[in-house]
């Protein structure tokens, strides 16, 4: 597949220009430079870009740049020029509410991806632990079901490293367990759900009791006990020494060399392969408690509030809004999110077919042994979009890897999702986001 960084060389945007007769002059920043480049671009008040397509803005950014007069309110543009996004808001009013700032304005166009709902949403768990079944079988071990059994299994991986390396041709050495700390889907927090009260931890450290009380996970006794247990694993050389510092590329490289006994990620095929790993079930804690704390915001599926913004330098806001609205068209959003079809000399994500009614429908191609993340990044453009549950088998088929993940999630974890509530996607004020930042630092 193509891997150009120039958006105008992406087939998706080339087709969009043909359809709309709108040419975009893009400035493209590579991912590891984006935050700094974005801040510099938005500091040039007299020479701002018209907008940011993949803005990557959190609540604090949106409110700060709005207060400074750098980004503009969008609600009137949405109501006048964006029928596709309006339809999404009408079908799911909670998304409009979630996009609305405390001052009543909407400052950004969102990214929305649904697959399943409630406890059965694919986003209910992000950081799935995958354990190496091939190693378990070779060592004649079962899949662990308690924290004590997991520790013994990791010890077995460590103590039989030489045998495993010889048997499976592992280069670089066996790593019993690896992760990327505080990195969303790559974080190991799911392992400590069985400690204490059973809240474990979430990416933003909020949880909701069955009585509807919002709590902060890191001050709970169960969290402290779980962290002490993880510390024991580190002390016994069961954890990758780079787990607290490594970046995604390093994490993946070691996985592709088949070095992991246990790792954490959204989809194991991005790290290693489906054949060698199984999902590690919810582990019973020291007192026998078994629980899966669902990912916050997952009741409303995948949602990124600050995906796309317009600035005060945008002179034709109506045209910009109408063009962005095309990203929310039901046949366009899946392509922006995953990739496209019909690109010559490329690994295409889709082929264009038809649904049962004979209307156009995007059909996912078989990815084979390819990493879903890598092949999709070569064609997709991301940005603002919406993929709703109602679109599947009407405008687009479900991705095979997502269906595999969802089916296995339901089989392994659904029965242990005991909590009634998750913390919703709240648009906080600047004052509240500052407080949360202080708590995280402390």
Each model region followed by its residue ranges:
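General small-molecule cofactor/ligand-binding pocket signal
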Residues: 23-29, 242, 278-280
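Conserved small-residue motifs centered on glycine
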Residues: 332-442
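Carboxylate/His-rich catalytic cores and anion/metal-binding grooves
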Residues: 69-99, 154-158, 168-207, 254, ...
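Long, His/Glu/Asp-enriched segments that create or flank divalent metal/ion-associated functional microenvironments
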Residues: 14-15, 265-268, 322, 406-410, ...
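Helix-loop-helix "hinge/cap" segment bordering the ligand-binding cleft or interdomain interface
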Residues: 75-79, 102-186, 208-254, 307-345
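Extracytoplasmic/periplasmic substrate-binding proteins
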Residues: 2-8, 13, 115-130, 137-143, ...
